[in-house]
């Protein structure tokens, strides 16, 4: 019997001072969650009910796909992370600690190493493959600035799965299966999402897709083609190669021109009266590695911008930071006049789209001079990388239509890890020829607690949460407008019992509060429907309110059950 007088849902009149996003404001105010520290949250009964529904959907679909559930320790020996090589790569977000015996451990943000250790030396033959194990449990990332409530916290509930395969083809099959499984999970939750091309980040691997729920407060920029199914995170987006109809600058190869104080692309284009499309921009960054740092130069078209994650991946750095003027001078680089012709002792990369371009303009590596007539040919193929930031209005790499930029929130990520971890940790099996081979691995994560917040980011109004029937903690709230009205209270109790017996999740608001307070709480908590039992009962009428648009409908009591079965059940 779920009556409001017995239900623990402490609501707040004011939002937390650090709350800026609707999900953070409403979930805290409505009593779904309670913050107990920086990036740390308790889930109260309302939040736990939603969390359980999300977990059940995830579990049902994963089990249907043939994955098997396990439950690994929250704590992982640091030696496993050292063995895989990720101990230092992951950075400060990985919480490291020692026990009383000085043994080193980590709180796992992901469990590739732990899961590989689980199957290592136990799965020994190709006959035991493929295998897919998953868990739904707590993870921890020591975020520098936890914010946005459940969207960027330190402790979170996540489903992480790991698959093991005898060959790359079978890994590809499982990757496609998980693509369909994740799509089904999010469809069942009623969320508007896109599966997008993505960067693999610290987890690594040969390919990955992110699952993004569209929301105007999304933290990620994504590019979507509305003509085909192409979608990508801006960090990984590609485009059809750009062209320009304006005239190219004409000059002999690598002619040197005096360009006094012409340090920017705009001033360079104006100086030569050309489109910036025909210029080459140099962006200098300091690349941070595990044991060293060095300057790296990235050359892109003057009309484009550098995408820093792409640049970081191109040079395999842990991080890229801006280079100072002193560092440039020490390396012999002249800011505003850098080019790759004659560039010595410095790593450099060139954007793919510049390969085989002709009659370009770029710096001459000499103050106040540029080179005209540069042909980007006969260079080492390894220097050419995808470096540019794709933008709205660029053309789709698949069909050529215009790309549109949207905001999204990442809720899931699937990876083809290949043999990266199995080789590092010497985890092998015997193939059908009796030869020892490293496993091919995939990993698949979905943010369970994050989905709770994402559902509200995608569905809310100025009054509060708007839950759909699939995720709502209660599908229907019965509100008695006046507890002194004994007939109304008796009718509400009987209706509550009848609906509960039908399997409907109902909350009976039997509090001795003003009607306005009850309505405000209904709108804040966001249950899909409310039945208001008040004076209309004298005329055998009850008011049904739909939370999504707050439309009200008077229903005759003798038609009530039939209408509820159609709309609510």
Curated annotation (Swiss-Prot):
Disulfide bonds: none
Presence of keyword Protein biosynthesis: yes
EC numbers: 6.1.1.15
Molecular-function annotations in GO: aminoacyl-tRNA deacylase activity; ATP binding; proline-tRNA ligase activity
Main location: cytoplasm
Pfam families: HGTP_anticodon, tRNA-synt_2b, tRNA_edit
Source organism, top-level taxon: Bacteria
Catalytic reactions of this protein: tRNA(Pro) + L-proline + ATP = L-prolyl-tRNA(Pro) + AMP + diphosphate
GO biological process: prolyl-tRNA aminoacylation
InterPro entries: aa-tRNA-synt_IIb (IPR002314), aa-tRNA-synth_II (IPR006195), aa-tRNA-synth_II/BPL/LPL (IPR045864), Anticodon-bd (IPR004154), Anticodon-bd_dom_sf (IPR036621), Pro-tRNA-ligase_IIa (IPR002316), Pro-tRNA-synth_IIa_bac-type (IPR004500), Pro-tRNA-Synthase_IIa_type1 (IPR023717)
Subcellular location: Cytoplasm
GO cellular component: cytosol
Keywords: Aminoacyl-tRNA synthetase, ATP-binding, Cytoplasm, Ligase, Nucleotide-binding, Protein biosynthesis
Family: Belongs to the class-II aminoacyl-tRNA synthetase family. ProS type 1 subfamily.
Entry remark concerning the domains of this protein: Consists of three domains: the N-terminal catalytic domain, the editing domain and the C-terminal anticodon-binding domain.
Subunit structure, interactors included: Homodimer.
Function: Catalyzes the attachment of proline to tRNA(Pro) in a two-step reaction: proline is first activated by ATP to form Pro-AMP and then transferred to the acceptor end of tRNA(Pro). As ProRS can inadvertently accommodate and process non-cognate amino acids such as alanine and cysteine, to avoid such errors it has two additional distinct editing activities against alanine. One activity is designated as 'pretransfer' editing and involves the tRNA(Pro)-independent hydrolysis of activated Ala-AMP.
Protein name: Proline--tRNA ligase
Organism the protein comes from: Campylobacter jejuni subsp. jejuni serotype O:23/36 (strain 81-176)
Phylogenetic placement of the source organism: Bacteria, Pseudomonadati, Campylobacterota, Epsilonproteobacteria, Campylobacterales
Encoding gene (name): proS
């Amino acid at each position: 019997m779920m009556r409001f007088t017995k239900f623990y849902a402490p609501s707040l009149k004011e939002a937390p001072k650090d709350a800026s996003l609707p999900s953070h404001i409403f979930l805290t105010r409505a009593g779904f969650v309670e913050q107990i520290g920086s990036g740390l949250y308790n889930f109260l009964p309302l939040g736990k009910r939603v969390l359980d529904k999300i977990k059940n959907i995830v579990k049902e679909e994963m089990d249907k796909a043939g994955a098997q559930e396990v439950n690994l320790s929250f704590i992982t020996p640091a030696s496993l992370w050292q063995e895989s090589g990720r101990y230092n790569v992951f950075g400060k977000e990985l919480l490291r600690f020692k026990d009383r015996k000085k043994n080193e451990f980590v709180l796992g943000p992901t469990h590739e190493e732990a899961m590989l250790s689980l199957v290592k030396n136990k799965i020994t033959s190709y006959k035991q493959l493929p295998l897919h194990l998953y868990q739904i449990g707590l993870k921890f990332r020591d975020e520098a600035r936890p914010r946005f409530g459940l969207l960027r916290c330190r402790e979170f509930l996540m489903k992480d799965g790991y698959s093991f395969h005898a060959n790359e083809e079978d890994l590809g099959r499982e990757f496609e299966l998980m693509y369909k499984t994740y799509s089904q999970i999010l469809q069942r939750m009623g969320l508007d999402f896109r599966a997008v091309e993505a960067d693999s980040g610290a987890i690594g691997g040969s390919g990955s897709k992110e699952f993004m729920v569209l929301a105007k407060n999304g933290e990620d920029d994504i590019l979507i083609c509305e003509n085909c199914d192409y979608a990508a995170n801006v960090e990984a987006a590609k485009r059809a190669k750009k062209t320009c109809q304006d005239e190219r600058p004409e000059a002999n190869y690598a002619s040197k021109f005096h360009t006094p104080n012409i340090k920017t692309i705009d001033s360079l284009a104006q100086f030569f009266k050309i489109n910036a499309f025909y210029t080459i921009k140099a962006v200098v960054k300091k690349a941070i590695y595990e044991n060293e740092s060095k300057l790296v130069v990235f050359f892109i078209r003057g009309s484009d911008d550098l995408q820093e994650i792409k640049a970081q991946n191109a040079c395999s750095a842990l991080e890229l930071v801006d280079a100072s003027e002193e560092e440039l001078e020490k390396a012999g680089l002249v800011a505003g006049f850098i080019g790759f012709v004659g560039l010595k002792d410095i790593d450099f990369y060139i954007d793919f789209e510049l390969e085989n371009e002709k009659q370009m303009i770029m710096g001459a590596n000499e103050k106040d001079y540029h080179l005209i007539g540069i042909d980007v040919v006969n260079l080492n193929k390894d220097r050419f990388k995808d470096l540019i930031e794709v933008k709205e209005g660029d053309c789709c790499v698949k069909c050529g239509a215009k790309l549109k930029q949207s905001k999204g929130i990442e809720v899931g990520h699937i990876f083809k890890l290949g043999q990266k971890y199995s080789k590092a940790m010497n985890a092998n099996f015997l193939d059908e020829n009796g030869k020892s081979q490293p496993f091919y691995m995939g990993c698949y994560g979905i943010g369970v607690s994050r989905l709770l917040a994402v559902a509200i980011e995608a569905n809310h109004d100025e009054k509060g949460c708007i839950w759909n029937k699939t995720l709502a903690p209660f599908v229907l709230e019965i509100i008695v407008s006046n507890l002194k009205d004994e007939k109304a209270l008796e009718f509400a109790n009987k209706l509550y019992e009848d609906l509960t017996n039908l399997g409907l999740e109902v909350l009976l608001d039997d509090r001795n509060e003003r009607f306005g307070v009850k309505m405000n709480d209904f709108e804040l908590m966001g249950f899909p429907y409310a039945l208001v039992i008040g004076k209309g009962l004298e005329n055998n009428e009850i008011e049904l309110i739909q939370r999504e648009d707050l439309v009200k409908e008077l229903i005759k009591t003798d038609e009530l059950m039939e209408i509820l079965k159609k709309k609510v059940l």
